Amino acid sequence: MTTNAGPLHPYWPQHLRLDNFVPNDRPTWHILAGLFSVTGVLVVTTWLLSGRAAVVPLGTWRRLSLCWFAVCGFIHLVIEGWFVLYYEDLLGDQAFLSQLWKEYAKGDSRYILGDNFTVCMETITACLWGPLSLWVVIAFLRQHPLRFILQLVVSVGQIYGDVLYFLTEHRDGFQHGELGHPLYFWFYFVFMNALWLVLPGVLVLDAVKHLTHAQSTLDAKATKAKSKKN
């Protein structure tokens, strides 16, 4: 990107020259309402499904965790998958998801600059954590023995990617957004991404707890069987 004396876009650094930029024709509230409406419908649908389709009854916490993984599957596969496919065309495209990314990029312009780390990180997220998030939901509904391992793998992967996401921007001096802006910095950049540190962190502890208990039970049975032989 080259510099431009008079920026005609809302992105940072303000000297960026974005010749192909086309402003969104949808207001911010419209974009956010669309995103959160779809997310809300998905949460309600997953909640109802987890109460009816599970092989064994699931508790409130487990059903809420499945709602989280369903939302993750949607965001990783659809929204981030869109970015992976069309990141080179976002600036001039007016499809809803392109406008969503142009709106989010006001808090992190790496998404409209084709930043190498961002593209690679989002590709891994869309291709791995998206499908695996949906597999977590199915695994818990079916009581699959891999369910807590899948939960652990996905959650650790999400935390790892999110930590790198924050640290790379920190090392760049937070130059890709307006530092301290209540919406673009604190809500888009900090809060929305911090969710993928806090919730996966809780789910990692949950998975470790159950896997540790299962291993302890197996070890106890093995010890008991060995003592009987002796």
From Swiss-Prot:
Domain of life: Eukaryota
Modified-residue entries (N-acetylthreonine), positions: 2
Major localization class: endoplasmic reticulum
Effect noted on mutating residue 47 to C: In MEND; patients have increased concentrations of plasma 8(9)-cholestenol, 8-dehydrocholesterol and 7-dehydrocholesterol; probable hypomorphic mutation
Reported effect, residue 121 to A: Reduces catalytic activity to less than 35% of wild-type
Effect upon mutating residue 80 to A: Reduces catalytic activity to less than 10% of wild-type
Reported impact of residue 189 to A: Reduces catalytic activity to less than 35% of wild-type
Enzymatic reactions: lathosterol = 5alpha-cholest-8-en-3beta-ol; zymosterol = 5alpha-cholesta-7,24-dien-3beta-ol; 5,6alpha-epoxy-5alpha-cholestan-3beta-ol + H2O = 5alpha-cholestane-3beta,5,6beta-triol; 5,6beta-epoxy-5beta-cholestan-3beta-ol + H2O = 5alpha-cholestane-3beta,5,6beta-triol
Keywords: Acetylation, Cataract, Cholesterol biosynthesis, Cholesterol metabolism, Cytoplasmic vesicle, Disease variant, Dwarfism, Endoplasmic reticulum, Hydrolase, Ichthyosis, Isomerase, Lipid biosynthesis, Lipid metabolism, Membrane, Nucleus, Steroid biosynthesis, Steroid metabolism, Sterol biosynthesis, Sterol metabolism, Transmembrane, Transmembrane helix
Mutagenesis / variant outcome for changing residue 125 to A: Reduces catalytic activity to less than 10% of wild-type
Pathway stated in the Swiss-Prot or TrEMBL entry: Steroid biosynthesis; cholesterol biosynthesis
Localization, UniProt: Endoplasmic reticulum membrane; Nucleus envelope; Cytoplasmic vesicle
Its membrane topology: Multi-pass membrane protein
Known function: Isomerase that catalyzes the conversion of Delta(8)-sterols to their corresponding Delta(7)-isomers a catalytic step in the postlanosterol biosynthesis of cholesterol.
Reported disease: Chondrodysplasia punctata 2, X-linked dominant: A clinically and genetically heterogeneous disorder characterized by punctiform calcification of the bones. The key clinical features of CDPX2 are chondrodysplasia punctata, linear ichthyosis, cataracts and short stature. CDPX2 is a rare disorder of defective cholesterol biosynthesis, biochemically characterized by an increased amount of 8-dehydrocholesterol and cholest-8(9)-en-3-beta-ol in the plasma and tissues. MEND syndrome: An X-linked recessive disorder associated with a defect in sterol biosynthesis. Disease manifestations and severity are highly variable. Clinical features include intellectual disability, short stature, scoliosis, digital abnormalities, cataracts, and dermatologic abnormalities.
Additional remarks: Binds to the phenylalkylamine calcium-ion antagonist emopamil, an anti-ischemic drug.
This protein's name: 3-beta-hydroxysteroid-Delta(8),Delta(7)-isomerase
Organism: Homo sapiens (Human)
